[in-house]
């Protein structure tokens, strides 16, 4: 698995398509995490199960910004962070993309 992260609208998907054209892409994975949280499912467990079925996938997830005022939004930020840490740990390679430039960080 390859994990690509970075801020919103920084060119992560274009970078992934250019660098890994043969791989299945899962862009905006933070929205999958949000769905799992809303359904009361553990997003790390759901991600682990997905990776078992798709070990060669490229997962693209935006970093989430400042700490929000609402408690439910803070919970989501925390869960996205936990999933990001899990993905980085499990990934063969990790890239951070800024302004369309990917930097390998693992």
Q: Model-derived features: where do they sit?
A:
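Glycine-rich P-loop/Walker A and Walker A-like loops and their local beta1-loop-alpha1 context
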Residues: 1-24
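Conserved substrate/cofactor phosphate-moiety recognition/catalytic segment
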Residues: 17-41
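Active-site donor-binding loop signature of nucleotide-sugar glycosyltransferases
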Residues: 6, 28, 99
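Short, basic, glycine/proline-bearing loop/turn elements
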Residues: 2, 33-37, 66-69
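Structural motif
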Residues: 3, 25-27, 58-60
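Glycine-rich nucleotide phosphate-binding loop and flanking beta-alpha elements
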Residues: 10-11, 32, 102
């Amino acid at each position: 698995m390859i994990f690509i992260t970075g801020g919103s609208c920084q060119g992560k998907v274009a970078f992934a398509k250019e660098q890994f054209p043969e791989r299945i892409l899962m862009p905006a994975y933070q929205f999958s995490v949000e769905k799992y949280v809303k359904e009361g499912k553990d997003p790390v467990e759901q991600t682990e199960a997905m990776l078992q079925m798709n070990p060669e996938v490229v997962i693209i997830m935006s970093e989430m910004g400042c700490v929000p005022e609402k408690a439910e939004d803070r919970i989501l930020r925390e869960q996205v962070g936990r999933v990001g840490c899990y993905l980085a740990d499990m990934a063969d390679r990790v890239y951070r993309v800024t302004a369309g430039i990917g930097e390998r960080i693992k």
